[in-house]
Amino acid sequence: MMMRCVNGQTAQDHLVTQLPGLSGNIGVKSYTGYLLANATRGRYLFYWFFESMRNPSQDPLVMWTNGGPGCSSLGGEASEHGLFLVNADGATITRNPYSWNRVSNILYIEQPVGVGFSYSNSTDDYQNLNDVQAASDMNNALRDFLTRFPQFIGRETYLAGESYGGVYVPTTAYNIVEGNGKGQQPYVNLVGILVGNGVTDAEADSNSIPPMMKYHSLISIKYYEEGYKACQGDFYANQNLPACQKFLTDSSNAMGNINPYYIYDSCPWLGINLQQKLKTTQEMTFQVLDPKTQQPVKIHPLFQMYKHGGWSKRVANERNFAPRFETDAPCVPNQSIAKYFRRLDVQQALGVRRKTADPNGWNICTGIINYTQVYSTILPFYAKLLPHIRILVYSGDTDMVVNGLGTQAAIDKLQLQETSSWRTWEFDSALGTVVGGYIRKFEKSGKGLTFITVRGAGHMVPLVKPDSAFYMFKNFIDGTCC
């Protein structure tokens, strides 16, 4: 039997007391370790936990995941809303004045297995990952965390994530709700979820990309109209028609080497020289299943840019060379983050006990996993969750990859009652009161779904607009917004 310490954690958990590159003490209690996700297969998910700086004994517990699939949640900690942000030199870190642990106890989990420091004793798992297994593993890992830290049993709990987290978060939330109903222990007091620029519904998400390109002058109105005709009014359904496919490919190539995750920015660190150095014929396998036949379907790369291989394909097609094997999130200055977490002294400080599953070492996104997208739409999960929890869906409005137009179209499919129509939301910044974005509210069975845009933000909202993101997050978990 594992001996339990007085403050709740077990001998499996590592108290982080210092971090290389940090000037001064950490300042909060922080733990790392490996959470049991599946006992039969021996799957373990690495986590990094930070106590709240406000009131750790009362503030909610928030579990965060990044997307990919295959991208590490430590990237969210180190570049978005974590307490410590990795500097460009990859050697030093800076305290983040807008860290989300200022008002919450936050748990970053690297998942699925094969990502970051997470691993499986059954190594064939890395080639057989999917949405169903990921949700089950996250549910189990969270309950294992509560077992180790029983002070959070019964505490208000939120799940949060971005990008492919739009699949991870709702599916995991429903797995938790079902588990609670079946008596799975310990009980998780799940009260809400937050999804940022999240993959939601394949049809709505995909059909919004060409209009987004038109509205932001990335393609001409005339060419858009020609493409709309070639695709017979439905870009997603008719993407494999030769004329439609040509329009999608040509539109994709016409953008040039911009950053589709933040369209008013360039993508210098995904330059052609770097691509040519790293090119290979191999790339991560990612299958999408047809919901009716459960057979793999062919999806155009323009509709798969949220997957870190999709952008590679687009640039490769444009420049007429083989796509690179993506081992990092495109258009994010992440090499500094990889450099930091690959350091032996950093891994020792974090209590890392074994090598990464990725032979290349820790990467912000791994290329070793094969992942199958089981759900082409997450809307049924939203419908099932609404009677139980609050939902916040937020969208940086300069992201083309998973943009707010598609997210709104997806939400409208739920046919919810709109309780508050489109209006601004504001917050106090260093410049005074500013418009943070726009908001719509919906309701079903007494629980609410709120859609928020974050003005000027991209795919990873806290990366570009940390102040807006913190205000939105704080007010949602405090119940003063949405």
UniProtKB/Swiss-Prot annotation:
Active site per database record: 163, 399, 459
Entry's Gene Ontology BP terms: proteolysis
Record-level Gene Ontology MF annotations: serine-type carboxypeptidase activity
SS bond partners: none
Enzyme class: hydrolase
Record-listed E.C. numbers: 3.4.16.-
Induction: By growth on mammalian cells.
InterPro entries the record matches: AB_hydrolase_fold (IPR029058), Peptidase_S10 (IPR001563), Ser_caboxypep_his_AS (IPR033124), Ser_caboxypep_ser_AS (IPR018202)
Swiss-Prot/TrEMBL keywords: Carboxypeptidase, Hydrolase, Protease
Pfam family membership, one: Peptidase_S10
Record-stated family: Belongs to the peptidase S10 family.
Record function comment: May be required but is not sufficient for increased virulence.
This protein's name: Virulence-related protein Nf314
